[in-house]
Amino acid sequence: MKQSFEGFMKTAMEKKTLDFDNLTKPVFLTKAHRKELALKRCQDEIADRDRRSIVQISRSNSDNDDGNRPRDVKRERHRSHDHDRNRESDREFREREVKARVEKLEMVKREKEINAMKEQYLGTTKPKKRVIMKPSKNFRFDWENTEDTLSGEMNVLYQNPHEAQPLFGRGCRAGIDRREQKKLMTGKHEREKREEEDKHWSEKKLEEMNERDWRIFKEDFNISYRGSKIPHPMRNWEETIPLGLEQRDVIGISATGSGKTAAFVLPMLAYISRLPPMREENQTEGPYALVMVPTRELAHQIEEETVKFSRYLGFKAVSITGWESIEKQALKLSQGCEIVIATPGRLLDCLERRYVVLNQCNYLVLDEADRMIDMDFEPQVSEVLDVMPCSNLKPEKEDEELEEKKIYRTTYMFSATMLLSVERLARKFLRNPVVVTIGETTKFITQQVIMTKESDKFSRLKKLIDDLGDDKTAIVFVNTRNKVDYIVKNLEKVGRCRVTTLHAGKSQEQRDYSLEEFKKKRFNVLVTTDVLGRGLDILDLAQVINYDMPNTMDLYTHRIGRTGRAGKTGVATTFLTLEDKDVFYGLKQKLNECNSLVPPELARHEASKFKPGTFPDRFSHF
């Protein structure tokens, strides 16, 4: 049966495809097999060469043959026999040569493998570099010093100089007394030295400052240090911020409004500027710097201040806080950013959901650390710090020198008070920190305490607001949300002020609106809870009113710290009732420290004389 043309073409294509697959498919050959194939190729080449030589010889013989004479058969037979014998010996020689060459190549390869293993496991001795001695500073001549012909003066006039004689005056040369000259110059130097010491430090250049000037400078600004190898503080912005630029861990305890944000933002930007730019290759490793704060309002405020500095450098800052869409925040993080400002709870959520990582974050700021501990954020803060890379921590010993090119973790911790819990957190995560104390937290604040009853508080509040006027602003602090709504409702009925509210029960948009309008002085009274007691900077706040006394003195310090910021004065008024006796002792001590007036009722009360938890009469029965 004849095969059709299509069938024939199909069979041919399948065969061609199969042959091509067999040719392209890699086949594993053993070492012995490869050696056998190489030997066979050499033998084939030799046989082919011999075959071509025989054909060439036969052709030449046929050309030279006369054809008329009979061929000498015997002589031709002997010649062919000799040729076969020579060819056999040549073949054997070539085979031995090929075999020896293959064995030599195998031996060289084996020696290379052995040398590589020796170099890997035993190591090699590196050749020592020849030490070149430095040339001597004093050049030595080949001759003796006594042979120098220029050592003595050859001119007779200069060999015997004429001694000058006194001409006039008091027996001095040219009437000039050298001793009097030296005395006058010494007196001039002493006067200049005294004038230099009496000059104020602000009139001197940075390199002219001595230890006395630095001591006076620190006393003028109430700056104190605890630590070693601490650089001098900066006098103005042109001299930068020394501690941050040296990558030292810092614990800052200072008054509110003293520029703490700039103190960690500027060194942070200087640190980021030394790192590679944020691109698609490294933005998946997370931000370069992290700032943790206790409240959403403080996070947004720090974000605004950071953007003011970072926008000129092209750095991006993102805030991560609660009460906002975590998906939108995750989208911002996925686009890459150098700085993240976050509250501990929301940041931990993003870490658990893999929205952000901290693989390359080596700059950490804990702002209002005592407030975060009071709000029970210490476990979340510890979990976040444990996620950060620990391979670049500074050495625990202070004497060890840091490598210049290596990047170490830098940690800033700011607080208005130094509590034991803050010290415990610092000992765990900070290495050889410098404790910097700047100013007094209540230096520019006038504190007033009014003993009253709960029913009389609102009437006293109305009187304070009436005395405030329309051009000044005040913040009223209470302890509960319900009381915020109660006070605002009654103040709106009276209609004597423009009042707004802010507490944790409101949405983030409402809180931002109230705070922004209060800063613009559209409202002059803000009633709030402790959500506004930390970190926020409100300019020209005239008065703080504690409608309810807080439960701790730490909260009291931060509440009244909203006024009297950045060197300006302010007034803090507190309504105190007998139900607040747990803080009587601490409040009395605070007022005495600030030289403020202590109400007689508070001074005479038994609870103000002893620290809470102590029993003064426990030894009275002995």
Curated annotation (Swiss-Prot):
PROSITE patterns given in the database record: DEAD_ATP_HELICASE (PS00039), HELICASE_ATP_BIND_1 (PS51192), HELICASE_CTER (PS51194)
Residues that coordinate or bind ATP: 254-261
GO cellular component: catalytic step 2 spliceosome
Family: Belongs to the DEAD box helicase family. DDX23/PRP28 subfamily.
GO biological process: mRNA splicing, via spliceosome
InterPro entries in alphabetical order: DEAD/DEAH_box_helicase_dom, Helicase_ATP-bd, Helicase_C-like, P-loop_NTPase, RNA-helicase_DEAD-box_CS
EC number, UniProt record: 3.6.4.13
Catalysed reactions, as listed in the record: ATP + H2O = ADP + phosphate + H(+)
Residue intervals of the Helicase ATP-binding domain: 241-436
Protein name: Putative DEAD-box ATP-dependent RNA helicase 44
Domain of life the protein comes from: Eukaryota
Classification via CDD domains: DEADc_DDX23, SF2_C_DEAD
Keywords from the UniProt entry: ATP-binding, Helicase, Hydrolase, Nucleotide-binding, RNA-binding
